[in-house]
Protein backbone atom coordinates (compact mmCIF):
# COMPACT_ATOMS: atom_id res chain seq x y z
CA UNK A 1 0.00 0.00 0.00
CA UNK A 2 1.18 3.49 -0.86
CA UNK A 3 0.31 7.01 0.25
CA UNK A 4 0.81 10.52 -1.09
CA UNK A 5 2.43 13.07 1.20
CA UNK A 6 1.19 16.50 0.15
CA UNK A 7 2.25 20.00 1.22
CA UNK A 8 -0.59 22.45 0.71
CA UNK A 9 -0.54 26.14 -0.10
CA UNK A 10 1.41 26.19 -3.38
CA UNK A 11 0.24 27.40 -6.78
CA UNK A 12 -0.22 24.63 -9.32
CA UNK A 13 0.10 25.63 -12.95
CA UNK A 14 2.08 25.32 -16.14
CA UNK A 15 1.52 23.06 -19.12
CA UNK A 16 0.24 19.49 -19.28
CA UNK A 17 -1.12 17.17 -21.96
CA UNK A 18 -4.42 15.46 -21.16
CA UNK A 19 -4.26 11.71 -20.65
CA UNK A 20 -6.46 9.27 -22.53
CA UNK A 21 -9.94 8.66 -21.17
CA UNK A 22 -10.05 5.58 -18.93
CA UNK A 23 -13.73 5.09 -19.73
CA UNK A 24 -12.89 5.01 -23.45
CA UNK A 25 -9.77 2.89 -23.11
CA UNK A 26 -11.43 -0.02 -21.30
CA UNK A 27 -14.26 -0.79 -23.78
CA UNK A 28 -12.00 -0.09 -26.77
CA UNK A 29 -9.41 -2.57 -25.46
CA UNK A 30 -12.12 -5.19 -25.01
CA UNK A 31 -13.54 -4.45 -28.48
CA UNK A 32 -10.29 -5.96 -29.82
CA UNK A 33 -11.87 -9.31 -28.89
CA UNK A 34 -14.25 -8.88 -31.84
CA UNK A 35 -11.58 -9.47 -34.51
CA UNK A 36 -8.68 -11.86 -35.09
CA UNK A 37 -6.61 -9.09 -36.68
CA UNK A 38 -4.21 -6.61 -35.08
CA UNK A 39 -5.78 -3.71 -33.18
CA UNK A 40 -3.54 -0.76 -32.33
CA UNK A 41 -4.79 1.72 -29.74
CA UNK A 42 -3.07 5.04 -29.06
CA UNK A 43 -3.27 7.41 -26.07
CA UNK A 44 -4.01 4.57 -23.63
CA UNK A 45 -3.44 5.80 -20.05
CA UNK A 46 -1.02 3.88 -17.86
CA UNK A 47 -3.41 3.26 -14.97
CA UNK A 48 -4.34 0.35 -12.73
CA UNK A 49 -7.72 -0.41 -14.36
CA UNK A 50 -6.07 -0.74 -17.78
CA UNK A 51 -3.47 -3.10 -16.30
CA UNK A 52 -6.22 -5.34 -14.90
CA UNK A 53 -8.05 -5.51 -18.26
CA UNK A 54 -4.81 -6.35 -20.06
CA UNK A 55 -4.12 -9.08 -17.47
CA UNK A 56 -7.56 -10.56 -18.24
CA UNK A 57 -6.82 -10.61 -21.97
CA UNK A 58 -3.38 -12.15 -21.42
CA UNK A 59 -4.91 -14.81 -19.18
CA UNK A 60 -7.33 -15.93 -21.90
CA UNK A 61 -4.63 -16.08 -24.58
CA UNK A 62 -4.45 -12.66 -26.25
CA UNK A 63 -1.13 -11.34 -27.56
CA UNK A 64 -0.39 -7.84 -26.23
CA UNK A 65 2.51 -5.50 -26.93
CA UNK A 66 2.72 -2.19 -25.06
CA UNK A 67 4.98 0.70 -26.01
CA UNK A 68 4.42 3.84 -23.96
CA UNK A 69 0.80 4.85 -24.39
CA UNK A 70 0.24 2.60 -27.41
CA UNK A 71 -1.11 -0.95 -27.39
CA UNK A 72 -1.08 -3.68 -30.01
CA UNK A 73 -3.62 -6.43 -29.35
CA UNK A 74 -4.23 -9.61 -31.33
CA UNK A 75 -6.85 -12.14 -30.28
CA UNK A 76 -6.43 -15.01 -32.75
CA UNK A 77 -8.13 -17.39 -30.37
CA UNK A 78 -8.72 -17.82 -26.67
CA UNK A 79 -7.87 -20.64 -24.30
CA UNK A 80 -10.95 -20.31 -22.08
CA UNK A 81 -14.24 -18.48 -21.66
CA UNK A 82 -14.21 -18.59 -17.85
CA UNK A 83 -12.83 -15.41 -16.29
CA UNK A 84 -10.86 -15.68 -13.05
CA UNK A 85 -12.63 -13.88 -10.18
CA UNK A 86 -9.30 -12.48 -8.96
CA UNK A 87 -9.55 -10.12 -11.95
CA UNK A 88 -13.25 -9.31 -11.91
CA UNK A 89 -13.14 -8.51 -8.18
CA UNK A 90 -10.81 -5.60 -8.94
CA UNK A 91 -12.67 -3.77 -11.65
CA UNK A 92 -16.26 -2.85 -12.41
CA UNK A 93 -15.50 -2.60 -16.14
CA UNK A 94 -15.00 -6.37 -16.32
CA UNK A 95 -18.75 -6.43 -17.02
CA UNK A 96 -17.78 -5.23 -20.52
CA UNK A 97 -16.49 -8.71 -21.29
CA UNK A 98 -20.07 -9.91 -21.77
CA UNK A 99 -20.79 -8.31 -25.14
CA UNK A 100 -17.62 -9.25 -27.07
CA UNK A 101 -17.42 -12.75 -25.57
CA UNK A 102 -20.99 -13.73 -26.35
CA UNK A 103 -20.66 -12.17 -29.81
CA UNK A 104 -17.45 -13.85 -30.96
CA UNK A 105 -17.13 -16.93 -28.76
CA UNK A 106 -20.77 -17.69 -27.92
CA UNK A 107 -20.37 -17.88 -24.15
CA UNK A 108 -18.80 -16.44 -21.02
CA UNK A 109 -18.63 -17.47 -17.36
CA UNK A 110 -17.56 -14.76 -14.90
CA UNK A 111 -18.06 -13.61 -11.32
CA UNK A 112 -19.97 -10.45 -10.52
CA UNK A 113 -17.71 -7.40 -11.03
CA UNK A 114 -16.10 -5.38 -8.24
CA UNK A 115 -14.77 -1.81 -8.45
CA UNK A 116 -15.94 1.41 -6.77
CA UNK A 117 -18.53 1.23 -4.00
CA UNK A 118 -20.51 4.37 -4.84
CA UNK A 119 -23.97 2.84 -4.80
CA UNK A 120 -26.06 0.08 -6.30
CA UNK A 121 -25.23 -0.38 -9.97
CA UNK A 122 -27.80 -2.52 -11.75
CA UNK A 123 -26.89 -5.20 -14.26
CA UNK A 124 -30.47 -5.79 -15.43
CA UNK A 125 -30.14 -3.45 -18.41
CA UNK A 126 -27.13 -5.43 -19.65
CA UNK A 127 -29.04 -8.71 -19.45
CA UNK A 128 -32.18 -7.23 -21.02
CA UNK A 129 -30.29 -5.96 -24.06
CA UNK A 130 -28.19 -9.07 -24.56
CA UNK A 131 -31.22 -11.34 -24.15
CA UNK A 132 -33.09 -9.32 -26.80
CA UNK A 133 -30.25 -10.26 -29.16
CA UNK A 134 -30.61 -13.96 -28.28
CA UNK A 135 -28.23 -14.56 -25.37
CA UNK A 136 -29.39 -16.82 -22.52
CA UNK A 137 -28.51 -15.93 -18.91
CA UNK A 138 -27.77 -18.64 -16.35
CA UNK A 139 -27.17 -17.53 -12.76
CA UNK A 140 -24.78 -20.18 -11.42
CA UNK A 141 -23.62 -19.88 -7.79
CA UNK A 142 -23.39 -16.10 -7.94
CA UNK A 143 -21.64 -16.13 -11.31
CA UNK A 144 -22.82 -14.75 -14.64
CA UNK A 145 -23.04 -17.38 -17.36
CA UNK A 146 -24.18 -16.20 -20.79
CA UNK A 147 -24.57 -18.42 -23.84
CA UNK A 148 -25.69 -17.68 -27.40
CA UNK A 149 -25.79 -19.98 -30.41
CA UNK A 150 -26.66 -17.05 -32.65
CA UNK A 151 -27.26 -13.33 -32.12
CA UNK A 152 -29.98 -11.59 -34.12
CA UNK A 153 -30.58 -7.83 -34.22
CA UNK A 154 -33.52 -6.41 -32.30
CA UNK A 155 -35.19 -3.14 -31.37
CA UNK A 156 -34.98 -2.23 -27.69
CA UNK A 157 -35.65 0.63 -25.29
CA UNK A 158 -33.27 0.74 -22.32
CA UNK A 159 -34.89 1.53 -18.97
CA UNK A 160 -31.80 3.55 -18.04
CA UNK A 161 -29.16 5.19 -20.23
CA UNK A 162 -26.42 3.00 -18.78
CA UNK A 163 -22.99 3.58 -20.33
CA UNK A 164 -21.66 0.06 -19.87
CA UNK A 165 -24.96 -1.61 -20.82
CA UNK A 166 -25.05 0.45 -24.03
CA UNK A 167 -21.44 -0.52 -24.77
CA UNK A 168 -22.11 -4.22 -24.14
CA UNK A 169 -25.12 -4.19 -26.45
CA UNK A 170 -23.17 -2.33 -29.15
CA UNK A 171 -20.32 -4.85 -29.04
CA UNK A 172 -22.75 -7.77 -29.13
CA UNK A 173 -24.80 -6.38 -32.01
CA UNK A 174 -22.10 -5.31 -34.50
CA UNK A 175 -21.65 -8.95 -35.60
CA UNK A 176 -25.29 -9.97 -35.09
CA UNK A 177 -27.52 -10.88 -38.01
CA UNK A 178 -29.74 -8.00 -39.09
CA UNK A 179 -30.34 -4.57 -37.59
CA UNK A 180 -30.37 -3.44 -33.97
CA UNK A 181 -31.93 -0.21 -32.71
CA UNK A 182 -31.05 0.97 -29.19
CA UNK A 183 -33.33 3.70 -27.85
CA UNK A 184 -32.38 5.66 -24.71
CA UNK A 185 -28.77 4.71 -25.39
CA UNK A 186 -25.97 6.41 -23.46
CA UNK A 187 -24.10 8.95 -25.60
CA UNK A 188 -21.10 9.94 -23.45
CA UNK A 189 -17.82 10.77 -25.23
CA UNK A 190 -16.47 7.33 -24.33
CA UNK A 191 -19.47 5.63 -25.95
CA UNK A 192 -18.81 7.75 -29.04
CA UNK A 193 -15.16 6.63 -28.99
CA UNK A 194 -16.20 2.97 -28.93
CA UNK A 195 -18.64 3.46 -31.81
CA UNK A 196 -16.09 5.33 -33.91
CA UNK A 197 -13.48 2.65 -33.26
CA UNK A 198 -15.88 -0.14 -34.27
CA UNK A 199 -16.83 1.74 -37.44
CA UNK A 200 -13.13 1.99 -38.29
CA UNK A 201 -13.07 -1.83 -37.99
CA UNK A 202 -15.90 -2.19 -40.49
CA UNK A 203 -18.98 -1.96 -38.25
CA UNK A 204 -22.00 0.03 -39.39
CA UNK A 205 -23.22 2.18 -36.49
CA UNK A 206 -25.49 5.17 -37.13
CA UNK A 207 -26.61 7.92 -34.74
CA UNK A 208 -23.30 8.24 -32.88
CA UNK A 209 -23.56 10.95 -30.21
CA UNK A 210 -27.35 10.63 -29.97
CA UNK A 211 -29.65 8.58 -27.74
CA UNK A 212 -30.83 6.40 -30.63
CA UNK A 213 -28.28 4.07 -32.20
CA UNK A 214 -28.89 1.93 -35.26
CA UNK A 215 -26.45 -0.91 -35.80
CA UNK A 216 -26.44 -2.87 -39.03
CA UNK A 217 -24.76 -6.20 -38.38
CA UNK A 218 -21.74 -7.22 -40.46
CA UNK A 219 -20.13 -10.63 -40.92
CA UNK A 220 -16.61 -9.70 -39.88
CA UNK A 221 -14.56 -6.91 -38.32
CA UNK A 222 -11.01 -6.05 -39.36
CA UNK A 223 -8.09 -4.64 -37.41
CA UNK A 224 -7.63 -0.91 -36.94
CA UNK A 225 -5.50 1.88 -35.50
CA UNK A 226 -7.50 4.19 -33.24
CA UNK A 227 -6.66 7.06 -30.88
CA UNK A 228 -8.51 7.28 -27.56
CA UNK A 229 -10.02 10.68 -26.69
CA UNK A 230 -8.90 12.88 -23.82
CA UNK A 231 -9.99 12.21 -20.24
CA UNK A 232 -12.41 15.04 -19.50
CA UNK A 233 -12.54 13.91 -15.84
CA UNK A 234 -8.81 14.54 -15.51
CA UNK A 235 -9.19 17.87 -17.32
CA UNK A 236 -12.05 18.90 -15.01
CA UNK A 237 -10.00 17.94 -11.95
CA UNK A 238 -7.01 19.97 -13.18
CA UNK A 239 -9.20 23.01 -13.87
CA UNK A 240 -10.39 22.98 -10.25
CA UNK A 241 -6.89 22.37 -8.91
CA UNK A 242 -5.36 25.29 -10.82
CA UNK A 243 -8.25 27.67 -10.08
CA UNK A 244 -8.29 26.93 -6.35
CA UNK A 245 -4.52 27.25 -5.91
CA UNK A 246 -4.21 30.42 -8.03
CA UNK A 247 -2.21 28.80 -10.81
CA UNK A 248 -2.30 29.46 -14.54
CA UNK A 249 -2.66 26.25 -16.53
CA UNK A 250 -2.70 25.13 -20.16
CA UNK A 251 -4.08 21.65 -20.81
CA UNK A 252 -3.14 20.41 -24.27
CA UNK A 253 -5.09 17.97 -26.47
CA UNK A 254 -8.05 18.20 -24.11
CA UNK A 255 -10.90 17.61 -26.63
CA UNK A 256 -12.68 20.83 -25.54
CA UNK A 257 -15.76 20.12 -27.67
CA UNK A 258 -17.09 18.19 -24.66
CA UNK A 259 -16.81 21.13 -22.24
CA UNK A 260 -19.78 23.37 -23.02
CA UNK A 261 -21.94 22.39 -20.04
CA UNK A 262 -18.94 21.72 -17.80
CA UNK A 263 -17.76 25.30 -18.39
CA UNK A 264 -21.23 26.62 -17.55
CA UNK A 265 -21.33 24.73 -14.24
CA UNK A 266 -17.84 25.88 -13.28
CA UNK A 267 -18.79 29.48 -14.07
CA UNK A 268 -21.58 29.24 -11.47
CA UNK A 269 -18.81 28.74 -8.91
CA UNK A 270 -16.82 31.71 -10.19
CA UNK A 271 -14.34 29.62 -12.17
CA UNK A 272 -13.83 30.51 -15.81
CA UNK A 273 -11.66 28.87 -18.42
CA UNK A 274 -11.22 29.25 -22.16
CA UNK A 275 -10.60 26.76 -24.93
CA UNK A 276 -9.76 26.55 -28.59
CA UNK A 277 -9.95 23.54 -30.92
CA UNK A 278 -7.48 21.47 -28.88
CA UNK A 279 -6.50 23.14 -25.61
CA UNK A 280 -8.00 24.43 -22.36
CA UNK A 281 -6.66 27.53 -20.58
CA UNK A 282 -7.18 28.39 -16.90
CA UNK A 283 -6.16 31.93 -15.86
CA UNK A 284 -4.60 32.68 -12.50
CA UNK A 285 -7.18 35.22 -11.32
CA UNK A 286 -10.59 33.67 -10.63
CA UNK A 287 -13.64 35.19 -8.96
CA UNK A 288 -14.31 32.07 -6.82
CA UNK A 289 -17.79 33.24 -5.83
CA UNK A 290 -21.11 31.40 -6.15
CA UNK A 291 -23.53 32.99 -8.61
CA UNK A 292 -26.99 33.01 -7.04
CA UNK A 293 -30.07 31.95 -8.98
CA UNK A 294 -32.72 34.50 -9.96
CA UNK A 295 -34.26 36.06 -6.85
CA UNK A 296 -31.15 35.44 -4.77
CA UNK A 297 -31.81 31.72 -4.32
CA UNK A 298 -29.10 29.16 -3.55
CA UNK A 299 -28.09 27.45 -6.80
CA UNK A 300 -28.34 23.71 -7.32
CA UNK A 301 -25.78 21.67 -9.23
CA UNK A 302 -26.93 18.22 -10.28
CA UNK A 303 -25.76 15.46 -12.60
CA UNK A 304 -27.33 13.18 -15.17
CA UNK A 305 -26.64 11.11 -18.28
CA UNK A 306 -24.69 12.92 -21.00
CA UNK A 307 -24.99 15.66 -22.14
CA UNK A 308 -25.91 16.61 -18.56
CA UNK A 309 -23.14 17.32 -16.06
CA UNK A 310 -21.15 14.09 -15.57
CA UNK A 311 -21.53 12.21 -12.30
CA UNK A 312 -17.79 11.53 -12.12
CA UNK A 313 -17.13 15.26 -11.60
CA UNK A 314 -19.58 15.64 -8.70
CA UNK A 315 -16.95 14.82 -6.06
CA UNK A 316 -14.69 17.45 -7.65
CA UNK A 317 -17.52 20.01 -7.57
CA UNK A 318 -18.05 19.40 -3.84
CA UNK A 319 -14.43 20.09 -2.88
CA UNK A 320 -14.39 23.06 -5.26
CA UNK A 321 -17.48 24.52 -3.57
CA UNK A 322 -15.69 24.48 -0.20
CA UNK A 323 -13.23 27.04 -1.59
CA UNK A 324 -15.59 29.55 -3.19
CA UNK A 325 -17.57 32.25 -1.43
CA UNK A 326 -21.23 31.34 -0.99
CA UNK A 327 -23.55 28.37 -0.56
CA UNK A 328 -24.53 25.73 -3.10
CA UNK A 329 -26.71 22.60 -3.08
CA UNK A 330 -25.06 19.62 -4.80
CA UNK A 331 -27.56 16.94 -5.85
CA UNK A 332 -26.06 13.59 -6.90
CA UNK A 333 -28.92 11.86 -8.71
CA UNK A 334 -27.19 8.77 -10.06
CA UNK A 335 -25.39 7.05 -7.16
CA UNK A 336 -26.53 6.96 -3.55
CA UNK A 337 -23.11 6.48 -1.93
CA UNK A 338 -20.93 8.94 -3.85
CA UNK A 339 -21.42 11.63 -1.18
CA UNK A 340 -20.11 9.50 1.67
CA UNK A 341 -16.57 10.88 1.47
CA UNK A 342 -17.60 14.36 2.67
CA UNK A 343 -16.91 13.46 6.31
CA UNK A 344 -13.23 13.58 5.38
CA UNK A 345 -13.60 17.13 4.04
CA UNK A 346 -15.49 18.10 7.21
CA UNK A 347 -12.57 16.67 9.19
CA UNK A 348 -10.32 19.12 7.31
CA UNK A 349 -12.58 22.06 8.19
CA UNK A 350 -15.14 22.17 5.37
CA UNK A 351 -18.66 23.43 6.09
CA UNK A 352 -20.83 20.72 4.57
CA UNK A 353 -24.26 19.44 5.58
CA UNK A 354 -25.08 15.93 4.34
CA UNK A 355 -28.84 16.17 3.84
CA UNK A 356 -29.34 12.59 2.63
CA UNK A 357 -27.38 10.06 0.52
CA UNK A 358 -27.95 12.20 -2.59
CA UNK A 359 -27.63 15.82 -1.44
CA UNK A 360 -25.14 18.04 0.34
CA UNK A 361 -25.15 21.76 1.09
CA UNK A 362 -21.69 23.30 0.90
CA UNK A 363 -20.83 26.75 2.29
CA UNK A 364 -17.52 28.40 1.49
CA UNK A 365 -14.98 29.66 1.67
CA UNK A 366 -13.69 27.32 4.40
CA UNK A 367 -10.02 27.23 5.40
CA UNK A 368 -8.88 23.59 5.27
CA UNK A 369 -6.14 22.05 7.39
CA UNK A 370 -3.97 19.10 6.41
CA UNK A 371 -4.99 15.68 7.70
CA UNK A 372 -4.60 11.94 7.20
CA UNK A 373 -7.21 10.75 4.69
CA UNK A 374 -7.99 7.50 2.88
CA UNK A 375 -9.26 7.34 -0.72
CA UNK A 376 -12.62 5.49 -0.81
CA UNK A 377 -12.90 5.49 -4.62
CA UNK A 378 -11.18 6.93 -7.67
CA UNK A 379 -13.10 10.22 -7.95
CA UNK A 380 -13.42 10.92 -4.22
CA UNK A 381 -9.70 10.15 -3.94
CA UNK A 382 -8.85 12.87 -6.47
CA UNK A 383 -11.16 15.27 -4.62
CA UNK A 384 -9.31 14.63 -1.37
CA UNK A 385 -6.02 15.19 -3.17
CA UNK A 386 -7.26 18.58 -4.40
CA UNK A 387 -8.34 19.40 -0.84
CA UNK A 388 -4.86 18.52 0.40
CA UNK A 389 -3.25 20.94 -2.08
CA UNK A 390 -5.60 23.72 -0.98
CA UNK A 391 -5.19 23.00 2.75
CA UNK A 392 -2.73 24.58 5.13
CA UNK A 393 0.05 22.19 6.14
CA UNK A 394 0.78 18.57 5.34
CA UNK A 395 -1.69 15.83 4.41
CA UNK A 396 -1.32 12.11 3.87
CA UNK A 397 -3.62 10.52 1.30
CA UNK A 398 -3.77 6.76 1.87
CA UNK A 399 -4.97 3.97 -0.43
CA UNK A 400 -3.70 5.77 -3.53
CA UNK A 401 -4.34 2.61 -5.56
CA UNK A 402 -7.88 3.94 -5.91
CA UNK A 403 -6.71 7.24 -7.41
CA UNK A 404 -4.27 5.47 -9.72
CA UNK A 405 -7.08 3.28 -11.05
CA UNK A 406 -8.20 6.29 -13.06
CA UNK A 407 -5.45 8.92 -13.08
CA UNK A 408 -2.12 8.39 -14.83
CA UNK A 409 1.26 9.00 -13.13
CA UNK A 410 -0.39 11.37 -10.66
CA UNK A 411 2.55 12.43 -8.50
CA UNK A 412 5.04 13.07 -11.31
CA UNK A 413 2.57 14.99 -13.45
CA UNK A 414 1.63 17.23 -10.54
CA UNK A 415 5.26 17.76 -9.53
CA UNK A 416 5.86 19.09 -13.04
CA UNK A 417 3.10 21.64 -12.36
CA UNK A 418 4.73 22.86 -9.14
CA UNK A 419 2.99 20.60 -6.62
CA UNK A 420 4.73 19.41 -3.47
CA UNK A 421 3.84 15.72 -3.45
CA UNK A 422 5.66 12.44 -3.04
CA UNK A 423 4.55 8.83 -3.14
CA UNK A 424 5.69 6.74 -0.18
CA UNK A 425 5.10 3.25 1.12
CA UNK A 426 2.46 3.29 3.85
CA UNK A 427 3.48 2.49 7.40
UniProtKB/Swiss-Prot annotation:
UniProt keyword Transferase, yes or no: yes
Cellular component terms per the entry's GO annotation: cytoplasm
Protein name: UDP-N-acetylglucosamine 1-carboxyvinyltransferase
Family, similarity comment: Belongs to the EPSP synthase family. MurA subfamily.
Subcellular location, record wording: Cytoplasm
Function of the molecule: Cell wall formation. Adds enolpyruvyl to UDP-N-acetylglucosamine.
Protein encoded by which gene: murA
Record GO terms (molecular function): UDP-N-acetylglucosamine 1-carboxyvinyltransferase activity
Enzyme class of the recorded protein, top EC level: transferase
Active site: 116
GO aspect biological process, one term: peptidoglycan biosynthetic process
Protein EC: 2.5.1.7
Keywords: Cell cycle, Cell division, Cell shape, Cell wall biogenesis/degradation, Cytoplasm, Peptidoglycan synthesis, Transferase
Pathway recorded for this protein: Cell wall biogenesis; peptidoglycan biosynthesis
Family annotation (Pfam families): EPSP_synthase
Cystine bridges: none
Cited Gene3D superfamilies: Enolpyruvate transferase domain
TM spans (from-to): none
Record field: catalytic activity: phosphoenolpyruvate + UDP-N-acetyl-alpha-D-glucosamine = UDP-N-acetyl-3-O-(1-carboxyvinyl)-alpha-D-glucosamine + phosphate
Chain positions recorded as phosphoenolpyruvate binding sites: 22-23
UniProt keyword 4Fe-4S, yes or no: no
Residues that bind UDP-N-acetyl-alpha-D-glucosamine: 92, 312, 334
